[in-house]
Regions:
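A generic structural motif
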Residues: 9-13, 71-73, 120-122
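Flexible helix-coil linker/hinge segments at domain or subdomain boundaries
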Residues: 35-38, 77
Length: 160
């Protein structure tokens, strides 16, 4: 059965990269003594996947991880055991059982909201609100994307 785990990442843990967060959860799952499913083969790994990785230095109140387990007592028990095995800066906020045909966590993320905070005395020297309004009022926001096959222009306005 597959679980969708929602967690917070905050405080000093915000400076930990995505691969280290994955390793943390592998160890936390073992410490919490969860009945995690493993891949077959010569080098078995826990079957888990994350939604979009959070950039280094950013905090989040809504990160998602899918974890496959063989059995569980209850979602609340999994939440408590993982929180007990966790470190300050990572907190499990919810655990849900997913239907068998549910998509992965990444496919479930439709949008993200960001909040920008400035340190005291470090406010921008321009009106941020009007700058954002001018930016969003543009008909096109073109950037050049460089790939192995060459470069091409992309209109960011379609994704905003």
């Amino acid at each position: 059965m597959k679980l969708r785990i929602k967690f917070r990442k905050y405080g000093p843990v915000r400076f930990i990269g995505h691969l280290d967060v994955m390793r943390f959860f592998q160890k936390a799952n073992r410490r919490a003594e969860l009945d995690v499913a493993y891949t077959g083969g010569f080098s078995p790994h826990q079957i888990m996947s994350f939604a979009a990785p959070l950039g280094v230095g950013l905090t989040s109140n809504g990160e998602y991880m899918d974890l496959e387990v063989h059995s569980l007592t209850s979602c609340e028990d999994v939440k408590q055991r993982l929180n007990a095995a966790s470190v300050p800066g990572i907190e499990i906020t919810s655990v849900k059982i997913l239907p068998d045909k549910a998509g992965n966590a990444m496919a479930s993320v439709a949008a993200a909201g960001y909040t920008v905070a400035f340190r005291e005395g470090r406010d921008p020297h321009f009106d941020l609100s009007s700058a954002v309004d001018r930016f969003l009022a543009k008909d096109e926001i073109l950037i050049t994307k460089e790939t192995k096959k060459g470069s091409r222009e992309i209109n960011l306005k379609e994704g905003i």
